[in-house]
């Protein structure tokens, strides 16, 4: 029993003495996929926004500006109404009433 005890103790100490290592990454300094996608999305968004602002500044007319503001206010009011209806329907569906 003495040799088995020492053998078991040796194996336990050997296991505890070794570090548990995960898989090694090829390049730990490379950015994550989500960061890369987020950066590309933000670059596309900023370029599209800059193009839209440039087009707006180039073709600025007061009548068009008034129409755009009116259209925005009406569409945002409609979207808030439809969002409220959708939220109400979703809550009713989840409650089961």
From Swiss-Prot:
Superkingdom of source: Eukaryota
Biological process terms in GO annotation: lipid catabolic process; lipid transport; positive regulation of phospholipid catabolic process
PTM comment text: Proapolipoprotein C-II is synthesized as a sialic acid containing glycoprotein which is subsequently desialylated prior to its proteolytic processing.
Keyword set, alphabetical order: Chylomicron, HDL, LDL, Lipid degradation, Lipid metabolism, Lipid transport, Secreted, Signal, Transport, VLDL
UniProt-annotated stretches for the region Lipid binding: 63-71
Gene Ontology CC: chylomicron; high-density lipoprotein particle; low-density lipoprotein particle; very-low-density lipoprotein particle
Name of one Pfam family that matches: Apo-CII
Residues making up the signal peptide according to the UniProt record: 1-22
Keyword DNA-binding attached: no
Major location category of this protein: secreted
One Gene Ontology molecular-function label: phospholipase binding
Keyword Ion transport carried by entry: no
Subcellular location: Secreted
Sequence segments annotated as region (Lipoprotein lipase cofactor): 75-97
UniProt record similarity statement: Belongs to the apolipoprotein C2 family.
Function of the molecule: Component of chylomicrons, very low-density lipoproteins (VLDL), low-density lipoproteins (LDL), and high-density lipoproteins (HDL) in plasma. Plays an important role in lipoprotein metabolism as an activator of lipoprotein lipase.
Name of this chain's protein: Apolipoprotein C-II
Organism: Grammomys surdaster (African woodland thicket rat)
């Amino acid at each position: 029993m003495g040799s088995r005890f020492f053998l078991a103790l040796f194996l336990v100490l050997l296991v505890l003495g070794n570090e548990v290592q995960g898989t090694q990454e090829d390049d730990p300094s490379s950015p994550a996929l989500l960061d890369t996608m987020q950066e590309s999305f933000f670059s596309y968004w900023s370029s599209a926004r800059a193009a839209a602002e440039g087009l707006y500044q180039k073709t600025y007319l007061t009548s068009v500006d008034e129409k755009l503001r009116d259209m925005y206010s009406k569409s945002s009011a409609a979207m808030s109404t439809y969002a409220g209806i959708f939220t109400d329907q979703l809550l009713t569906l989840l409650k089961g009433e």
